[in-house]
UniProtKB/Swiss-Prot annotation:
Odorant receptor. It is a multi-pass membrane protein. Residues 50-57, 121-139, 220-236, 293-313 are cytoplasmic. Keywords: Cell membrane, Disulfide bond, G-protein coupled receptor, Glycoprotein, Membrane, Olfaction, Receptor, Sensory transduction, Transducer, Transmembrane, Transmembrane helix. It comes from Homo sapiens. GO terms for molecular function: G protein-coupled receptor activity; olfactory receptor activity. The keyword Amino-acid biosynthesis does not apply. Its main location: membrane. The gene is OR2B6. This is Olfactory receptor 2B6. GO terms for biological process: detection of chemical stimulus involved in sensory perception of smell.
Length: 313
């Protein structure tokens, strides 16, 4: 990649909420707690899913991928935010900004695709239960996960290249907590209409295509569940999908408001808060949603804790 600004720009200033210094300490506390919970929660899901043989199923394989993604998602942004909240001079190096932009875009796109893959897994499990193990074999699961990651990172290469090749005007001040495409486009010295149109188009594709697949999957799932005679069977079927639906709703509702909403000066602070929610709060809530609503994960966690104490004895 030819990052044309690399030899000129050394660093960016991240404004965040610099005009409201009284918010810095509360945000520092919130970010620190959220990051700690995110690390602990997602590591717990990864360990439980990998170490408990009863959870070696496609559903938990994809959940492990989602937890790993959320770990990386927050780690690429939160540590830098914490440092800046504790500093008088809030900066990020040019190379750090490039890395943050690339990783943030890649993981965001990958998450959309993984959520669609997880809905397909639930569709097969509920609508084709007798053929589930045949259809969702290990090789297909690996291929679906790999395709999600590769597509997400390929999309990031494209968008990052388009954004970072634009000439940027001094002062290099980003009115945000992190390096995002919309914030960087505002620094450009040239017309960015074409870039904004491409960003909008790609965002629509990565939002609407996976969302359409999710909605189609759940339309078939709801139809299949309503045919189940017993109330207990219906409750169990809906229970396996409830956590996934909550996560999808959280992620899509916030991400759509950032990338598919037309820019407005009056909504810039709202955009910052929404970005913080889907970049920090949502990855923290995901493991809580899955563990609190999922009996198998809770039982697997208990077995893991019991094994740890047994080894210590």
């Amino acid at each position: 990649m030819n990052w044309v600004n690399d030899s000129i720009i050394q660093e960016f200033i991240l404004l965040g909420f610099s005009d409201r210094p009284w918010l810095e300490f509360p945000l520092l506390v919130v970010f620190l707690i959220s990051y700690t919970v995110t690390i602990f929660g997602n590591l717990t899901i990864i360990l439980v899913s990998r170490l408990d043989t009863k959870l070696h199923t496609p559903m938990y394989f994809f959940l492990t991928n989602l937890s790993l993604l959320d770990l990386c998602y927050t780690t690429c942004t939160v540590p830098q935010m914490l440092v800046n909240l504790c500093s008088i001079r809030k900066v990020i190096s040019y190379r750090g900004c490039v890395a943050q932009l690339f990783i943030f875009l890649a993981l965001g796109a990958t998450e959309y695709l993984l959520l669609a893959v997880m809905s397909f897994d639930r569709f097969v499990a509920i609508c084709r239960p007798l053929h589930y193990s045949v259809i969702m074999h290990q090789r297909l699961c690996l291929q679906l996960a790999a395709a999600s990651w590769v597509t997400g990172f390929s999309n990031s290469v494209w968008l990052s290249t388009l954004t970072l090749q634009l000439p940027l005007c001094d002062p290099y001040v980003i009115d945000h907590f992190l390096c995002e495409v919309p914030a960087l486009l505002k620094l450009s010295c040239v017309e960015t209409t074409a870039n904004e149109a491409e960003l909008f188009l790609v965002s629509e594709l990565f939002h609407l295509i996976p969302l359409t697949l999710i909605l189609i999957s759940y339309a078939f799932i709801v139809r299949a569940v309503l045919r189940i005679q017993s109330a207990e069977g219906r409750q169990k079927a809906f229970g396996t999908c409830g956590s996934h639906l909550i996560v999808v709703s959280l992620f899509y509702s916030t991400a759509v408001s950032v990338y598919l909403q037309p820019p407005s000066p009056s909504s810039k602070d709202q955009g910052k808060m929404v970005s913080l929610f889907y970049g920090i709060i949502a990855p923290m809530l995901n493991p809580l949603i899955y563990t609190l609503r999922n009996k198998e994960v809770k039982e697997g966690f208990k077995r893991l804790v019991a094994r740890v104490f047994l080894i210590k004895k």
